[in-house]
Amino acid sequence: MAKVSSKPPQLLDSARVLHYANVDKGVGFAGRTLLFVDGKELGKVPNLAICAEVSSGGVLLFHCSRAWKVFGCSAHDSVEAAKEKAERIYPGLSSRWVEAKASK
């Protein structure tokens, strides 16, 4: 069984974690993610991470399990755009983002 942690590792799928949030009971869910994996829409997840792709620096929003396994991701123009997208999916999430202290 995978270890459950509220804090992600420094890298997820070869991308450096910049910010992360735990989606707990106090956070809403809009009912739609509009993120499809293998032809099915991804539902509510317990963790989100905003990451910088190592080679390009592109911003990715990862939808993750409790153990930080990545289920799906979306690309964004900026960290702020990724946070705005996450807030549309999970109303009330904006105050829960934590800045990761990852080394470069």
What does each of the following model-derived ranges do?
Residues 93-104:
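Short, Lys/Arg-rich amphipathic alpha-helical interaction segments
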Residues 42-71:
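Short aromatic-glycine-(Arg/Gly/Cys) micro-motifs in beta-strand/loop hairpins
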